[in-house]
């Protein structure tokens, strides 16, 4: 079994706590369906205008040159590309909030996750989340699970405003925010490049091999198929 550090566990979401298919087939579908209407209804709002600036910057154009229709089309293309663009993630979070709060959307969390998180928390381990989805989207996902509200299990949530998930600096900043040394934090993810970045920052790492995730023969990270394979 993979060793658990005494102080903190930092978890990824997609492919780690949650089935990749829920993110791509359900959440992304909701975002695609509702994005154009949201952009039109909230033009001038902070999330829409931040996204407009990002699209304009990429095109080398002024914000005024990007119409609502062009903005929606560009953002839909980014969703299809699975772009980890912070402004897109913030906008998606707003769209998902409406879907969750209407009662029409419940998030998937693997059955082994909640018991393990509760066990680790009861042992005094700090729990935190690091995902490319916005903090708002993370909290919505864990608040509206089929098992109920799990947000109270976590001390902190981090998104790409902290830094890209494949850069060591982001993990160093997270450790600092938690008041810990990187070596006191265990990062759980299904993505080797993210684990490499966390390890470069000094964190301990375990790769989750959920269904559909293949083990990388060149990876040096410990592996586990379930959270209950990770023993304190």
From Swiss-Prot:
One GO BP: L-methionine salvage from methylthioadenosine
Keyword Signal attributed: no
Secretion signal span: none
Catalysed reactions, as listed in the record: 5-methylsulfanyl-2,3-dioxopentyl phosphate + H2O = 1,2-dihydroxy-5-(methylsulfanyl)pent-1-en-3-one + phosphate
EC numbers: 3.1.3.77
Gene Ontology terms, MF aspect: 2,3-diketo-5-methylthiopentyl-1-phosphate enolase activity; 2-hydroxy-3-keto-5-methylthiopentenyl-1-phosphate phosphatase activity; acireductone synthase activity; magnesium ion binding
Pathway listed: Amino-acid biosynthesis; L-methionine biosynthesis via salvage pathway; L-methionine from S-methyl-5-thio-alpha-D-ribose 1-phosphate: step 3/6; Amino-acid biosynthesis; L-methionine biosynthesis via salvage pathway; L-methionine from S-methyl-5-thio-alpha-D-ribose 1-phosphate: step 4/6
InterPro entries for the chain: Enolase-ppase_E1 (IPR023943), HAD-like_sf (IPR036412), HAD-SF_hydro_IA (IPR006439), HAD_sf (IPR023214)
Subunit composition and interactions: Monomer.
Function: Bifunctional enzyme that catalyzes the enolization of 2,3-diketo-5-methylthiopentyl-1-phosphate (DK-MTP-1-P) into the intermediate 2-hydroxy-3-keto-5-methylthiopentenyl-1-phosphate (HK-MTPenyl-1-P), which is then dephosphorylated to form the acireductone 1,2-dihydroxy-3-keto-5-methylthiopentene (DHK-MTPene).
Similarity field: Belongs to the HAD-like hydrolase superfamily. MasA/MtnC family.
Protein name, UniProt field: Enolase-phosphatase E1
Species: Sorangium cellulosum (strain So ce56) (Polyangium cellulosum (strain So ce56))
């Amino acid at each position: 079994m993979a060793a658990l550090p005494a102080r903190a566990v930092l978890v990824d979401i997609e492919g780690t706590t949650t089935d990749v298919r829920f993110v791509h087939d359900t959440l992304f579908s909701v975002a695609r369906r509702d994005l154009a209407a949201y952009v039109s209804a909230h033009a001038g709002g902070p999330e829409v205008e931040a996204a407009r600036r990002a699209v304009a910057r990429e095109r080398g154009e002024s914000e005024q040159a990007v119409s609502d229709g062009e903005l929606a089309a560009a953002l839909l293309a980014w969703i299809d590309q699975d772009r980890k663009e912070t402004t897109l993630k913030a906008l998606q979070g707003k769209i998902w909030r409406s879907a969750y709060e209407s009662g029409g959307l419940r998030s998937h969390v693997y059955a082994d996750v909640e018991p393990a998180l509760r066990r680790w928390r009861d042992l005094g381990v700090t729990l935190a989340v690091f995902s490319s989805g916005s903090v708002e989207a993370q909290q919505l996902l864990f608040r509206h699970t089929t098992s109920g509200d799990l947000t109270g299990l976590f001390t902190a949530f981090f998104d790409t405003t902290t830094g890209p998930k494949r850069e060591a600096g982001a993990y160093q900043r997270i450790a600092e925010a938690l008041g810990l040394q990187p070596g006191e934090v265990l990062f759980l993810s299904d993505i080797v490049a993210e684990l490499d970045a966390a390890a470069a920052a000094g964190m301990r790492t375990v790769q989750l091999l959920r269904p559909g995730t293949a083990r990388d023969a060149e990876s040096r990270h410990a592996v586990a198929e379930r959270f209950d394979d990770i023993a304190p």
